[in-house]
Amino acid sequence: MAPMDLSELKNRVSQAVDQMKDELVSISLDIHRNPELAFNEYKAAGWLSGFMEKQGFKVSRNVAGMETDFAAEFQSGEGGPTIAILGEYDALPEVGHACGHNIIGTSAVGAGAALKKALEGSGVNAKVLVLGTPAEEGGGG
């Protein structure tokens, strides 16, 4: 089978985002309502990595010696490039998610999940890797 063309892949990504929109907004709002500081993003990491598991990704936690990090992987076909997406989700003291990390983390998992859906059955070989990076504001990430 010949790989799908780029415009069709883009359309599939867009459709997948539309299908997941309500759940992604809900996750982002949950993270925003529950700000967690550097290295203590247990709820956020749980919601984000749980979403990735639900989307069929292989999820590993504590991959870099941090309790609130995660890596979510999906392989389409054999070989191909690795497409890595980073998502941060920590809050700032006193101002919470003033930097929008609730949106950044949620956008990362949404983009990864949409890309997975687009790649499935496309004939395109690639690995999608979504990395949950804690403590961007506090010396980690």
Predicted regions and their residues:
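Fold-level recognition of mixed alpha/beta catalytic cores in primary-metabolism enzymes, strongest
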Residues: 123-141
